[in-house]
Each structure stands twice: as structure tokens, then as C-alpha cells.
Amino acid sequence: MASFQCDIVSAEKAIFSGSAEQLIAAGVSGDLGILRGHAPLLTELKPGPVRVMREGGEEEVYYVTGGFLEVQPDVVSVLADTATRAHDLDEAAAEEARQEALKAMGDKQSDLDYTRAAAELAEAVAQLRTIQQLREKGSRR
């Protein structure tokens, strides 16, 4: 399979730069699969996993809190708000954040509090989904 240059960067640092055969990311309108030669594209990403399939079948999974995906003929760039390796996610902390967000949504003091709690809930659920996908990938090997 043909490859392309893939870069995943956040405001803090570059987290990945290398050759990839495929990239799958969570766009605001659904998951996107990118291969070499994909039509140029600029789209917003929602919190969730970004999966990079390297040459030889190796897969690397990252978690982004949102950002943008830019596709050019030979280069794909993920410009993330924040990004981390999926292996570095803390499942217990994500579950605790999910529980706190649910509680805050129930105890809403204002629309702003509810909106903030809903955003925190979406991020915690996305982290848990990323961890689950990583776990499922590991059990298939």
C-alpha cells in the first residue's frame, strides 16, 4: 500500500512524524479514513482517537481533545488542541471525570455550568472509548 507523510502536532509538541499507509480520525461529522491520494480536505476533529497505520501493519493510537485534520496530496497533518499517546491515558481518571461531569450536569447552577459539564463529559467518554479500542486491538493479537 502507498504511504504518505503524517504529522500529529499539538500546541505543546510534535507527537508523531513519519510515514503512514492510513489514518483514521474522529471528525465532527463522523470517522474519517485517509489513504494516499485522498482529495484535499480540511475538517474539524472532535475528542477521540487518531489511529495511524504504519508500513508493515504496525498501528499507533493517539488521543486528541479536538483540533483540525488537513489532507494534502502527500501530507496529512493533525493539528490537535492537545494530543497524547493512547497508552498514556489513565482509565481511572477518565472514569472519575465522567462521573463528576454527570454529577455537575445534574446539579447545574446555570446554562454555562451545564455546557461546561457536557463538554467535560464528552471528553471523558472519548478517552474511555479510545482506551476500549486500544484494549480490543490488543486482544485481537
UniProtKB/Swiss-Prot annotation:
The lineage of its organism: Bacteria, Pseudomonadati, Pseudomonadota, Gammaproteobacteria, Oceanospirillales. Produces ATP from ADP in the presence of a proton gradient across the membrane. F-type ATPases have 2 components, CF(1) - the catalytic core - and CF(0) - the membrane proton channel. CF(1) has five subunits: alpha(3), beta(3), gamma(1), delta(1), epsilon(1). CF(0) has three main subunits: a, b and c. This is ATP synthase epsilon chain. Its main location: membrane. Belongs to the ATPase epsilon chain family. It comes from Chromohalobacter salexigens (strain ATCC BAA-138 / DSM 3043 / CIP 106854 / NCIMB 13768 / 1H11). GO terms for cellular component: plasma membrane; proton-transporting ATP synthase complex. It is found in: Cell inner membrane. One of its GO terms (molecular function) is ATP binding. It is a peripheral membrane protein. InterPro entries: ATP_F1_dsu/esu_C_sf, ATP_synth_F1_dsu/esu, ATP_synth_F1_dsu/esu_N, ATP_synth_F1_esu_C, ATPsynth_dsu/esu_N. Keywords: ATP synthesis, Cell inner membrane, Cell membrane, CF(1), Hydrogen ion transport, Ion transport, Membrane, Transport. NCBIfam families: ATP_synt_epsi (TIGR01216), PRK00571.1-4 (NF001847), PRK13442.1 (NF009977).
